[in-house]
């Protein structure tokens, strides 16, 4: 989490007022939850590499997660339980490694690091109870020897600035970070999460309380920082205690602030839902609209209908040099024994193949080769 905040805030000008800690210190313990998923077969040995973990890397990891719907459901459900009882430090899942930080790879499919100051017995019992229906293996819920002492600070007279991004551990939420000053080498402030649909309200609430709001914008394949507001006349932020910026996040309580009366239209979002697709999986003989941005080609409309989820095109070697920017129509075919597709019409240049019409169309199967019943999974012909 600390690495994520550092990356998200790296290009923003933050307050440098030096703060002095108060006598109160928040003491926290670390707990590591790990387990293997039943009937989960996956290996990326010799291929996987992720040296830095930028916000773009985090968004890519969340995109990869969409290809594992069942596993995502289990992990996301567990995260929702933990968010209400502890603070999430990081998540590990074999296909994408550590979600926000950089660390050694564990031996289990899933690891969740949390820090807490409540009852471990209660947390452990709820984790075990939640995971019981999913038949996970090698479940471990253990505290480490790591103890954290988080300094607290009184709210200074300086004006905070705010950064808004997606919350990496649950994209149903946004992350709101307010920076007030520094202590030693650490920035000090307070962090909140709020349901993503409350973003317009959060922005209006913050406007009279901060010097500026910088929002991380998801632009599919890249991110940018958008300055939403910059004010020279502000009110004192209604909180009494700050901490060093860390894993500690609070739920944003809108009832502590005046209700906004107007809202600024937003043409950007911290997180846009996306999913990877093969062109084989798209419907044949209908118009499809695609956009290319930041080296990523993605689909926004099918048959003149806007999609709720952006479809990122996974290209094969045949189309690796083509840029999907415009509209196209495709159809699935059997070509030289291979189940594939061809683009039959497009507003941009693509290579073409001719359908074999004078030969029996027999498709090579990956298994069940003697069966007269033929279909495909997402990966195989059978």
Swiss-Prot record:
Annotated compartments: Virion
InterPro entries for the chain: Poxvirus_F5/I6_dom, Poxvirus_I6_C
Keyword match Hydrolase: no
Annotated protein name in UniProt: Telomere-binding protein OPG082
Family stated for the protein in its record: Belongs to the orthopoxvirus OPG082 family.
Cross-referenced Pfam families: Pox_I6, Pox_I6_C
Keywords, comma-separated and alphabetical: DNA-binding, Virion
UniProt GO BP: viral process
Induction, as annotated: Expressed in the intermediate phase of the viral replicative cycle.
Its biological purpose: Binds to the hairpin form of the viral telomeric sequence. Might direct genome encapsidation into the virus particle.
Single GO term (MF): DNA binding
Residues annotated as signal peptide: none
GO cellular component: virion component
């Amino acid at each position: 989490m600390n690495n994520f905040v550092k990356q998200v805030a790296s290009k923003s000008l933050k307050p440098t007022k030096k703060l002095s800690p108060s006598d109160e210190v928040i003491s926290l313990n670390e707990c590591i939850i790990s387990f293997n998923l039943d009937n989960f077969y996956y290996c990326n040995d010799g291929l996987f590499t992720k040296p830095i973990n930028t916000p773009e890397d985090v968004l890519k990891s969340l995109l990869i997660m969409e290809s594992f719907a069942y596993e995502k459901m289990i992990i996301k459900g567990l995260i929702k339980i933990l968010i209400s009882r502890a603070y999430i430090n990081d998540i590990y899942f074999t296909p994408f490694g550590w979600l926000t930080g950089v660390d050694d790879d564990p031996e289990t499919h899933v690891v969740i690091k949390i820090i807490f100051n409540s009852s471990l017995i209660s947390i452990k019992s709820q984790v075990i109870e939640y995971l019981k229906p999913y038949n996970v293996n090698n479940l471990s819920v253990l505290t480490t020897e790591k103890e954290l002492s988080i300094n607290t600070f009184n709210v200074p007279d300086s004006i905070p600035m705010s950064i808004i991004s997606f919350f990496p551990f649950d994209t149903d939420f946004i992350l709101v970070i307010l920076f007030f000053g520094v202590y030693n080498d650490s920035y000090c402030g307070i962090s909140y999460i709020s349901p993503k649909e409350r973003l317009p309200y959060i922005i209006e609430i913050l406007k009279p309380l901060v010097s500026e709001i910088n929002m991380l914008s998801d632009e599919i394949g890249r991110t940018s920082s958008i300055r939403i507001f910059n004010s020279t006349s502000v009110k004192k932020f209604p909180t009494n205690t700050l901490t060093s910026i860390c894993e500690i996040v609070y739920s944003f309580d809108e009832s502590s602030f005046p209700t906004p009366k107007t809202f600024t239209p937003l043409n950007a979002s911290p997180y846009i839902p996306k999913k990877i697709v093969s062109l084989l999986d798209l419907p044949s003989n209908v118009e499809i609209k695609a956009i290319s941005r930041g080296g990523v080609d993605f689909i926004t409309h099918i048959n003149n209908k806007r999609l709720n989820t952006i479809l990122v095109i996974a290209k094969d070697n045949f189309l690796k040099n083509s840029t999907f920017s415009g509209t196209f129509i495709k159809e699935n075919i059997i070509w030289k024994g291979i189940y594939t597709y061809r683009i039959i019409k497009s507003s941009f240049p693509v290579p073409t193949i001719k359908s074999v019409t004078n030969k029996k169309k027999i498709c090579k199967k990956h298994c069940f080769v003697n069966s007269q019943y033929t279909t495909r999974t997402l990966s195989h012909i059978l």
